[in-house]
């Protein structure tokens, strides 16, 4: 349906940042070089020790159930067929264990901080399920509604698979606009103090998703 497509394609608010990103990418060009021997060639690389066949990864988004009945499990299969990395969202419709069971390629787990207890639970489950890294989202302190969704009166509350069976209010486990029916999460703020705590929870590589300044990137490196 059209409203599902708008949910997938739309950027936050009036999509100004999306437009700027598109313009920046359109401004890039390739400088082809010729008369080279390309008999042996490879575009494979690795990211934090995870080998992939090409420098393209699947970034975390929730709510894949609006596009396929098998939701994120099917996305993971597609990533495996391309021999590349998939980052699975906290807001996935399938549980992280279900996605890991379906995957044939490497997985990272994207984490929203939902307070100490829920965050620790998710990190430990990701470790046990074989995920290769934790990617903590730091640039979504509260949901940013999409104007297209508001215009369409879009609301479709799909299951949050990672919290199935937990006795928690939706506002405790939501707080992202990646899944239809989002609500603002009422949890403690995320600061560098929480990052130190999180770093001590796991030996997996820890990535901060959404940093915008060199100063913050330097602080992240210092935190490990």
Residue ranges and their predicted role:
Residues 63, 76-77, 81, 98-102, ...:
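Alpha/beta enzyme core
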